[in-house]
Amino acid sequence: MGHKVNPIGLRLGINRTWDSRWYAGADYSRLLHDDLKLRAHLRRKLSGAGVSRVVIERPAKKPRVTIYAARPGVVIGKKGQDIDVLRKDLTRMAKTDVALNIVEIRKPEIDATLVAENIAQQLERRVAFRRAMKRAVQSAMRLGAQGIRINCGGRLGGAEIARVEWYREGRVPLHTLRADIDYGVATAKTTYGTCGVKVWIFKGEILAHDPLAQDRRAAEQAPQR
């Protein structure tokens, strides 16, 4: 079963927690739709900032949006101009004041979402897929990952028949619930069609029951801005 399901969904409440953290009654669907719109807008607006994930919390007064990005300077802009514009955009979309936090990802090479997006961008630039996969694996292992697996599927290299190629190094225990496994997907839009990229990164085991382990680790590595 561990090989079939999303590794993050399987570990929710064990060593991962939700990216949308709020409760709602009758207006649940509206708030969920708002979250989707906010995330889509941020992905589109901050495509060059290396955004890994967006956490949305809704306390009693105003929503709080936390952006985990590899290049926070792109988000903030000169003298904080860009972040002010972004905050106004989010406030207009949410129809209420929004608190905005930026957290820097110090090691983007071991963030599964960023690794997948990087490989997808290389495929779009016609870099050989095996070279892109191998380079990503070597970088992740050098920076402390205990294991990594990368899947690329589609018309790789412009082949007539689509296929799936994968590369793995170290161990990636998908059945072990206490394993801290990061998972990311990305799509490369090539001239031959779309290619899917999936990345699993094993960072070690979390022995204690700690759903907020990922957030705590990110906060320790970089102060919030």
Curated annotation (Swiss-Prot):
BP GO annotations: translation
Instruction: Tell me which family the UniProt entry assigns to this protein.
Output: Belongs to the universal ribosomal protein uS3 family.
Q: Name one GO molecular function term.
A: rRNA binding
User: Is tRNA processing tagged as a keyword?
Assistant: no
Keywords, A to Z, come to: Ribonucleoprotein, Ribosomal protein, RNA-binding, rRNA-binding
In Swiss-Prot or TrEMBL terms, this protein is called Small ribosomal subunit protein uS3
Q: Quote the HAMAP family the UniProt record gives.
A: Ribosomal_uS3_B (MF_01309_B)
- What organism is the protein native to? Gluconacetobacter diazotrophicus (strain ATCC 49037 / DSM 5601 / CCUG 37298 / CIP 103539 / LMG 7603 / PAl5)
Task: Using the record's annotation, list all stretches that form the KH type-2 domain.
Answer: 38-106
Q: Could you tell me which SMART domains the record lists for this protein?
A: KH
CDD domains cross-referenced by the UniProt entry? KH-II_30S_S3
Q: How does it assemble?
A: Part of the 30S ribosomal subunit. Forms a tight complex with proteins S10 and S14.
The protein's role, per its UniProt record: Binds the lower part of the 30S subunit head. Binds mRNA in the 70S ribosome, positioning it for translation.
Q: Cellular component terms, GO, for this chain's entry?
A: cytosolic small ribosomal subunit
The UniProt entry, under Pfam families, shows: KH_2, Ribosomal_S3_C
